[in-house]
UniProtKB/Swiss-Prot annotation:
Ranges of biased composition (kind: Basic and acidic residues): 49-60
Gene Ontology biological process: cell division; G1/S transition of mitotic cell cycle
GO cellular component, one term: cyclin-dependent protein kinase holoenzyme complex
Leader sequence segment: none
Induction field: By gibberellic acid (GA3).
Assigned keywords, A-Z: Cell cycle, Cell division, Cyclin, Mitosis
UniProt subunit comment: Interacts with CDKB2-1.
Tissue-specific expression: Expressed in the root apices.
This protein's name: Cyclin-B2-1
Function: Involved in the control of the cell cycle at the G2/M (mitosis) transition. May activate CDKB2-1 kinase.
Amino acid sequence: MDRASENRRLAAVGKPVPGIGEMGNRRPLRDINNLVGAPPHPSAIAKKPMLEKSGKEEQKPALVVSHRPMTRNFAASLTRKEQLDHQVSVADAAVVCTDPQKNPIPDGTVDDDVESCESNDYIAVDECNDTDEDESMMDIDSADSGNPLAATEYVEELYKFYRENEEMSCVQPDYMSSQGDINEKMRAILIDWLIEVHHKFELMDETLFLTVNIVDRFLEKQVVPRKKLQLVGVTAMLLACKYEEVAVPVVEDLVLISDRAYTKGQILEMEKLILNTLQFNMSVPTPYVFMRRFLKAAQSDKQLQLLSFFILELSLVEYQMLKYRPSLLAAAAVYTAQCALTRCQQWTKTCELHSRYTGEQLLECSRMMVDFHQKAGAGKLTGVHRKYSTFKFGCAAKTEPALFLLESGAGGYNLQKQPC
């Protein structure tokens, strides 16, 4: 029934019509004082219900939104509101639990909740521990799954082959005793000079390690007079460049870098002699091959990478380091660099898995590397130290050595000895 017919019916029976004055004129419907006759306007907010006689507290009604699309922002705001309400309720419960004298609690109510909260906390800790274990055994090749050059499908088989054949690149640690005219110090001078030549020509890292390997394998099998020792080093670098580099230095450049001590013909003759002595076996695993893998397992940044290579190149100069396998030298260099940067003994399970060495197995070699690091800037053979003191190599030589590894010699290997 419309409002006009209702007014006519009331007027017919003699009842006053709401909203009509003595002159019979209706007030404007939108006048703020005319509330009686105004039509009810639909409201989006529900009215509060009346309190029941039972005395229960009135609960806060939920906000009912009409004709509101469920957008992402709106759903996120509702979720945040529910989380805040839940946090407030948990905080209130915690306050009640911590002060039982002021807030007496019936048996079997909040205590059960507290016990369940404590059990959930323990579960959360266990889950964190499981997560740490999972992260410590991470898949280091997952990021390169789409890179065909990484060869992730058979990279494990490659390094298994390298480990099985790294003995081919090793020499007897006392081969210098068979040399009558040269000694360990002369070898150190030669290697230090070759590192400077390598830096001068801006050659690849693998070229340097292959050069040193060729020198040692040749000196093990061939007696060399003192005046031809530098010739062996220059020719070994030429062979390594032909094997590793794209642009090979010309022989004339090597003649100039050696201050014309040898001719082009002498270098070519020595090249034939070295190849025949080594039976043309140039493809041997060097410490560089393993270094790349172990740095990847350690999730290295640029700083760790440069410091690891600095420590490893210091070991190339030292004759006494020939007793260690190439894989162990690379692993010990990464381990020593990590200890120097973090100031604690650090060797993750992932590094142990891919290197096949534990921290305890690396400790002896690592202590020797720390000693080399400490004395790198002193003495006459400072080529490696000057190279890694430049900005190009991150001033890695200026990093403080991990001297605490030397101090822990009596106590043995202890991962928790120095807190991180």
